[in-house]
Amino acid sequence: MTCTLEKVLADAKSLVERLRDHDSAAEILIEQTTLLNKRVEAMKQYQEEIEVLNQVARHRPRSTLVMGIQQENRQIRELQQENKELHTSLEEHQSALELIMSKYREQVFRLLMASKKEDPTIVTQLREQHTNEMQAHIEKINEMATVMRKAIEVDEGRLCEDEERIKRLELENSGLRELLGISREAFLLLKRDDTSDSTSLSPLLTSTDISLRKS
């Protein structure tokens, strides 16, 4: 009985150590989430600056506008990839926590069964000792999950706005290209008409000049 009780206590201690390791991983995820939030804020500021620059975009070369759109697309893809990786890490961490919780409950049950005929205070002390630690870990995980969900919601909202802005810019760019093509065609047509008129008037001007000289 004593051997079994010691084994159960050792297993419980091992589970607590694993919980501490996962708690460290949770803190790392929280730091990454905080960093992502800062990047989202930086992206928001960047978009505000882009909005100001778009007001004078028509006075700049088309290549500058295209480069700005390409840079914005690249940043959006990077944020989407980082958001996806953080979301995957959160799911993996929660799955690991659920597995550890299941193992912990199993160990506590075995301890209860092994200590059924022993002093009940041992069971009570062990349960109180680990319940507090487990509750602290659960609260940290819930806090991390809340922060992650908020970051994901903010990120998705910003991405939707960015996609709409990009579509508007692409539509405007297409319209500018079309207007540029029309202007070029009109210029070439007028140039061709001027050349034709000059050619047809040349003999008439020459004849008139000769008549005036004879007079």
Curated annotation (Swiss-Prot):
One of its GO terms (biological process) is response to wounding. The keyword Coiled coil applies. It is found in: Cytoplasm. The gene is fgfr1op2. Residues 35-183 form a coiled coil. The keyword Kinase does not apply. InterPro entries: SIKE. It comes from the Eukaryota. GO terms for cellular component: cytoplasm. Its main location: cytoplasm. It comes from Danio rerio. This is FGFR1 oncogene partner 2 homolog. Keywords: Coiled coil, Cytoplasm. Belongs to the SIKE family.
